[in-house]
């Protein structure tokens, strides 16, 4: 997958080139580029924003630098990709959106600043996404969150594909508790079933604990899940414990 970002602050994306994503970039599983759209301004002061027509508070991102930066991306990549605008008015980002975006071969993020965008910028956009009902100072943090979450679904990004498949929210359930050595840490013992070697019992315990954690912390997720009879029985047990 190729990922492009249009941003005024390219250095903010340096951390994405570390750790798991950095390794994915190094081995070619991810092709990552950041374009400073200030480089594409046509005015002598390199301004990328201006006052809104009709008055109002704040400044708006101008269309020209974004259009020209996008043209440069298209020239370099052969296409502009699936263009995502980070905007509070967009659809709310979640696990399923990340999985959907991971099916694209090329993503381009527009990370804006200021009060908002010149409406004509939206002509370039295929998707508008929001992280939630709050406002950030710019779109960079939102873009980084989406890129990180989306990249986890790409082949060869995670060392173990099962990790992505078993992560929280993969199946509208929160992840079950996990433990590593030692089996007894200062009197805090690992549940016996996890050391029993009985894979069927371990799977049942994990499912039950996923259901328990979801019911206790995010019951709304259960509303969007069609429970099997086994899951209904386990959930009934949990509620009556």
Swiss-Prot record:
It is an enzyme of class 2 (transferase). It comes from Leuconostoc citreum (strain KM20). SUPFAM superfamilies: alpha/beta knot. This is tRNA (guanine-N(1)-)-methyltransferase. S-adenosyl-L-methionine binds at residues 112, 131-136. Pfam families: tRNA_m1G_MT. Gene3D superfamilies: 3.40.1280.10, tRNA(m1g37)methyltransferase, domain 2. It is found in: Cytoplasm.
